């Protein structure tokens, strides 16, 4: 298939969007605002998720519309210190407060008390893309192009802000009430300047250069995007094995096979994104994301319209009745205790 033609109009709007969004990110990142908000102003409703040193709770703010909810990430200071995650957490707070993409979950506020650190995230209430994919088996092609367009723009936005997102998978993509996507669960600990060799991410979505211990700071994670597009269309990932080393071999060999129902345009796009040689991988060439945006598989997809959320989503979650129990797993609840004395006043003084 012929190399993509770069259309001037797509080049112009993408360039303008990336320039303005980077300027906004830099302005917020350099401010490092310290909030005096208190957790006592929130009603904690239920646990949405739990991790090594904290949990995420569905919450409401006393002064807001009672229908408006937030997802508050609550981190225990003592656990953060013991796990040597102070610097990571401080950097993550700064980065999350600076992000402003419509396809990335935003952090609206961050504050602390004597015991915990709190990050107030926008609550995306339609559940995970993973659950939709498991329910449907595989998704219609139009759904796939609609979702892939948003993830492409989310990854390009993060890359443009020097942020490396290394855990792309359906479980980390949420659906909002309009049926649009938001990427979440970043784990950002720094802005990438130079090179990084860290092996992290979900095994089936790892890029070959991560497994081969090659630096990958200069390449945005289009390999993971290719795996996601494949899985949405097929219902399964292209490389899988229960033995990790065997799985890594399959990823590095990169011998792609396609279901018979994959169209030639989809096969061509995936062959060029799921590509071991980063010098030939779409997204990393001279035209950047435009090689993906202008690919024939996306010929009926209006990226600008999707960016403005003016395109009607192919599927909208049903949020009536007991939706919270249908879209989020049940967790054991624990009360949030706040001590009188702060054992770590210096470590988190700038949080």
Swiss-Prot record:
Any GO MF annotation of the entry: cAMP-dependent protein kinase activity
Limits of the Protein kinase domain: 42-298
CDD domains referenced in this protein's UniProt entry, alphabetically: STKc_PKA (cd14209)
Catalytic reaction equation(s): L-seryl-[protein] + ATP = O-phospho-L-seryl-[protein] + ADP + H(+); L-threonyl-[protein] + ATP = O-phospho-L-threonyl-[protein] + ADP + H(+)
EC main group: transferase
UniProt keyword Phosphoprotein present: yes
Classification via SUPFAM superfamilies: Protein kinase-like (PK-like) (SSF56112)
Tissue: Ovotestis.
PROSITE patterns associated with the record: AGC_KINASE_CTER (PS51285), PROTEIN_KINASE_ATP (PS00107), PROTEIN_KINASE_DOM (PS50011), PROTEIN_KINASE_ST (PS00108)
EC number of this enzyme: 2.7.11.1
Record-listed ATP binding positions: 48-56, 73
Keywords, comma-separated and alphabetical: ATP-binding, Kinase, Nucleotide-binding, Phosphoprotein, Serine/threonine-protein kinase, Transferase
GO cellular component: cAMP-dependent protein kinase complex; cytosol; nucleus
Keyword flag ATP-binding: yes
InterPro entries noted in UniProt: AGC-kinase_C, Kinase-like_dom_sf, Prot_kinase_dom, Protein_kinase_ATP_BS, Ser/Thr_kinase_AS, STKc_PKA
Domain AGC-kinase C-terminal intervals: 299-351
Phosphothreonine: residues carrying this PTM: 198
Modified residues (Phosphoserine): 339
Catalytic site: 167 (proton acceptor)
Pfam family, one: Pkinase
Domain of life, per lineage: Eukaryota
Annotated family: Belongs to the protein kinase superfamily. AGC Ser/Thr protein kinase family. cAMP subfamily.
Name listed for the protein in its UniProt record: Spermatozoon-associated protein kinase
Species, as recorded: Aplysia californica
